[in-house]
Every structure is written in structure tokens, then in C-alpha cells.
Amino acid sequence: MSNMIQRQARRAILLTPENEVLLMRIHEPGNEDVFWWIVPGGGIEPGESLEETLRRELREEVGLEDFEIGPLVWRRQHTFDWAGKRICQNEQYYIVHVSRFEPMMSDLAEAKVLDRFQWWPATELIHATEKLTPLSLPQIVAGYLDSGAPQELPELEILVD
């Protein structure tokens, strides 16, 4: 494996008025037996702002164009292997309130690792038997629904796979 890639990323927790969260089930390139559920988002391109990154990622990954970026609710540093590369990714998670829509991915490269989309009731996230990422997603969503955006962000979650 080559040197570690350092990357900044922004992700959106898409939340409906019915308290559903949109998740994407993805698998490792070339290994459809290893999969997990993630929220949409991705890496910051050179020169992009937070807003530009989230707008591009949500357009590419789920076809969402018209939305307002809500509060920052979580952050983590995730080190993992992807497509033969070691990546250390610093992620920030934002709430985005949306009406339920039919997601559609337009990024062909990412579509190769997408198994499906699913709207999950927030109350069912805690009972998920499949891997969610971040692992604390059920608590993040429940905390936001109970108390709104945190006054102070929790400690940086550090995860090394």
C-alpha cells in the first residue's frame, strides 16, 4: 500500500419532517461482501468552500439540488483502506432538512460501489444490525432530534479500520 492520503470531507445527514434519514449502502471496490451504510458527502476539491463541497456531493450522489445547509453536529477522523490506498479523512457532519425524495446517483465511478439507497426511520437506526458509519450515527440523530444542534461539538471521534 502506498503512503497515506490526507483528506478533508463534508457529509450531510439528510433528515425529513417524518424523522427519516437517507443512507447509502456501499461496498468496497471489488468486494461486494463487505458493505456498510453511510450518509452522502465526500472530499473537498481544491478551492471549494464547505457549501460548494456539500452542494456538489449531494448533487452527484443523490441528485439533490435545492437545500439549505443546517448545523454542524459531528466530526471525526477516519483512517481506512479504500481501493488499495490508505486514507486518513477528517469529516464534518451537517444536518440538512429535506422533504423525502427519490435519490439518484449521477457519479458513475461512485455508482459502481453503491448497492442501494434507503430512508431509515431515525428510531430504527439504533436497532440496525448492519454496519452504519459513523458508528455513532443513531446517537447523533437522536441527540439532534431531542435537543437540536449541540452547543459544543463532542470530542473528535477517531476511528482506525
Over which residues does each language-model region extend?
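Short hydrophobic alpha-helix segments
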Residues: 25, 73-76
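N-terminal first-folded block
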Residues: 20-23, 28-38
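Conserved N-terminal beta-strand and adjoining loop/helix that marks the start
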Residues: 1-22, 42, 70, 93
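Short connector loops at helix/strand junctions that flank enzyme active sites
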Residues: 7, 34, 39, 67, ...
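Tryptophan-centric aromatic hotspots in well-structured domains and transmembrane helices
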Residues: 6, 37, 74, 119-120
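Unchanged
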Residues: 44-68, 76-131
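Acidic surface patches and DE-rich sequence motifs
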Residues: 16, 32, 81-82
